[in-house]
């Protein structure tokens, strides 16, 4: 489902699922930050080879270009070539270069056929982050399915229209640059409106927000009391 293939602009299924993840991260960025919050992780995020506390998505040049085409014209008509990698040894042929990158400054990165959530602390159980990720992606896929099932007319046109809507509304969460730079922190917070919750104290209230309680109870993941109890424990 998250394998773009050689021509991702033609892979509607991939684009729909990728867009659903983009929407999920954009809508629930505060909760994603909160679910990895701890005193130790506050010191780690943004330094020492760790991503910043600002939740953004790295897609790589190829996929970013595809979604930019969709945002501009409503559909993508081409995909950038991945290119080749040469290492300067004549006896070794050029190797195909992966279209994704290893941008270690991104907290949520696409790496070929999957997304990596890199903000989780090294000594933290992955249970809560996985529970949240599964829930927010399920909600986003629910939204996508509801929109497409209600669409009238040509189905492919409805898919393209939905992709454009998601990218236009949530594309601000996509960032392929240096997450450590001061310029990005200013751009993210002031130009893009992305949350920058630097401390656990700032982040944790997102777990008991009205949106969080509604999300977990709607999909029968946690009751309101269970949500509140986890907040108190954290």
Task: Name each model feature, range by range.
Residues 24-234:
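Acidic, glycine-enriched catalytic cores built around paired aspartates
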Residues 2-38:
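Catalytic or ion-translocation cores adjacent to nucleophile or general acid/base/metal-coordination motifs
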